[in-house]
Amino acid sequence: MRKWNYQEALAQFFTSPVQSNAPEEHLVISREKSVIAQVLRKYKNPSFKLQSPLNVQFLSSNALELGVDAGGPTTAYFFYLMQDLMRGSFNGIQLFQGEAGHLVPSVDYDLVSSCFFGIVGKMIVHSFLHQCRGLAGLSPAIISYIISGTRDTVLEYLVVDDVPDPCLREILNEVKV
């Protein structure tokens, strides 16, 4: 399998976002459970097509909610998924640290070595492809890194507020003055 760089991957996705003639991907989401835990296997599966139309249904109290996915359930699904990613409500694992607007990925060997952030990236791209807003609250330095793929561009966006540890942030602010 050919490995693309980020520019080729984005160009591929955005030249043909959602392919309306492709078979639908069906998702049934329980409102009582973590959304990440319910869809993780889908995103790990290479046959899961991000560009296929989605048909999302929600379960409440073990009963399917009535309705047709004309866009509302899909938007709600991505809203809840991005909320779970920001809160880190996946088996108690905190995926991002810091405050809103300055969130940075957690430094966790298991998350990095298992390529979990690659799956998180697929979830975010999937959200964009379906005209949803993606993951809000990331540090501008992290966004710069995602876009450029190089650490050099991060420095111009890096600020003390990007340090997730409040004690260390306070010390850095004292040194800065």
Where are these regions (language model features)?
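Long, Ser/Thr/Pro/Gly-rich and/or acidic low-complexity regions in intracellular
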Residues: 1-177
